[in-house]
Each structure stands twice: as structure tokens, then as C-alpha cells.
């Protein structure tokens, strides 16, 4: 199997364009990319490593790269039990851009999380989404549960 990096770049750019449109930020793909990356990295931090590996197996190459970039597998995962804590973790992954990207609003941040998981259903099977949901704390299950059937 030959690696076709031009194809991965094209697919990644198409994904980002479509995702930015879905997130109602069609003219700011940089922001959309930061938001997506922050949400994926926060998810990666709280689900078991085995579940991350199963998720990665279903992602296209250009999303695998986003997911694993900077990943350091830790035995002690952050203790995130509530949506507000998850949103704080997402913002932490976004760094100094979080102030502008999430507009100081949990409502905006939660909408971005919901939209991201709906959008990910294009790439991730229902069974894998259920497995991810099952690995989440009770108060976080709704970020995937309410979006499973899309």
C-alpha cells in the first residue's frame, strides 16, 4: 500500500471545510480545526487507551493524525465526571485561543461538542460510538447518547 500524502491532505482539507460549515464558521477553518482538535484530545484524555485504539482504527488517515498528535499515554487519566469539567479540559487543549474560540460560554462549547459527535458519525460506527459512550462517566454519556442515531 503506497502512502499518498497529497490525497490525505486533500481529504483533510475537504473534511475541515465541511466541518467548519457544519459548525457555522465557514470562513474560519483555523478556528474549526482548533475546536475539533481540542474536543478530540479531551476525549482521548478521558477514555481508556484500548477504546482510543478502537476509535483510531475507524478514523480515516487524516483524522488519525489529528487524534494522535502529541499523545502521551498516561496511566492516570484526569478525573472528569461532569460536562463543565470536560469543557474546561477542551478549553485547556485549545490554549490561549480558547477565549475566542469558545466565547466564554459553556453553551457554545457544549454545542460544539454535540455537533462534533454528530459529525463524527460519518466515520465512526454506531457500535463504536456506543462503546465510547459506555466508557464515559454518567454525566458525560449524553454528549454521545443524544447523537447516536444521526
Regions found by a protein language model. Give the residues of each.
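The feature marks the first
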Residues: 1-49
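Short, solvent-exposed interaction modules
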Residues: 67, 71-124
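Extended amphipathic alpha-helical scaffold segments
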Residues: 13-16, 63, 94
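Short, low-complexity cationic-aromatic patches
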Residues: 26-37, 44-53, 103-115, 119-134
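Residues that form generic nucleotide/phosphate-binding pockets
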Residues: 18, 22, 89, 93, ...
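Intrinsic-disorder-associated interaction segments
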Residues: 1, 5-8, 56, 79, ...
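Extended intrinsically disordered, low-complexity coil regions enriched in Ser, Thr, Gly, Ala
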Residues: 46-79, 124-150
Amino acid at each position: 500500500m503506497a502512502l499518498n500524502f497529497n490525497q490525505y491532505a486533500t481529504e483533510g482539507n475537504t473534511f475541515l471545510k465541511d466541518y467548519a460549515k457544519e459548525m457555522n464558521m465557514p470562513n474560519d477553518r483555523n478556528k474549526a480545526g482548533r475546536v475539533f482538535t481540542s474536543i478530540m484530545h479531551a476525549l482521548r484524555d478521558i477514555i481508556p487507551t484500548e477504546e482510543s485504539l478502537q476509535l483510531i482504527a475507524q478514523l480515516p488517515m487524516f483524522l488519525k493524525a489529528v487524534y494522535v498528535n502529541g499523545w502521551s499515554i498516561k496511566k492516570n487519566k484526569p478525573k472528569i465526571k461532569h460536562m463543565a469539567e470536560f469543557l474546561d479540559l477542551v478549553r485547556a487543549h485549545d490554549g490561549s485561543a480558547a477565549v475566542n474560540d469558545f466565547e466564554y460560554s459553556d453553551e457554545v462549547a457544549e454545542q460544539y461538542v454535540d455537533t462534533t459527535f454528530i459529525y463524527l458519525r460519518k466515520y465512526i460506527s454506531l457500535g463504536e460510538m456506543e462503546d465510547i459512550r459506555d466508557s464515559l462517566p454518567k454525566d458525560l454519556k449524553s454528549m454521545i447518547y443524544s447523537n447516536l442515531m444521526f
